[in-house]
Amino acid sequence: WGATVITNLMSAIPWIGQDIVEFIWGGFSVNNATLNRFFALHFLLPFVLAALVIMHLIAMHDTVGSGNPLGISGNYDRLPFAPYFVFKDLVTIFIFFIVLSIFVFFMPNALGDSENYVMANPMQTPPAIVPEWYLLPFYA
């Protein structure tokens, strides 16, 4: 349903809408090629994010010191970057994974929605995402 809405919104752009839809989805309708492209992009996005993090770490840790937080002109009082910020980053990542593990392994349904267990009816739009009546012309 979301892909259909995106397709309809993109196709409403004058002159270039159809070209944008075909570029994004591979066609106007949501079919197997669309789903393959969607899954491929969502598979690649975490790796892109990890690459950006590594580029950030290389750029930040490659310098001699911090960004001079005290505003001192000389290098004598500058803080070394690696011992403080790397440890802080590692502690933060460790705490994040502990909290994530608690939710995943001990409370898997804590952040879920009870409607996830309702059998789906493909012929009916779920009530939670039915658009307001005044938006219907844009989705048609």
Curated annotation (Swiss-Prot):
Function: Component of the ubiquinol-cytochrome c reductase complex (complex III or cytochrome b-c1 complex) that is part of the mitochondrial respiratory chain. The b-c1 complex mediates electron transfer from ubiquinol to cytochrome c. Contributes to the generation of a proton gradient across the mitochondrial membrane that is then used for ATP synthesis.
Name of the protein: Cytochrome b
Membrane topology per record: Multi-pass membrane protein
GO molecular function: metal ion binding; ubiquinol-cytochrome-c reductase activity
Keyword Transmembrane: yes
Subcellular location: Mitochondrion inner membrane
Binding site for heme b b566: H56
Organism name: Aspergillus terreus
This protein's UniProt keywords: Electron transport, Heme, Iron, Membrane, Metal-binding, Mitochondrion, Mitochondrion inner membrane, Respiratory chain, Transmembrane, Transmembrane helix, Transport, Ubiquinone
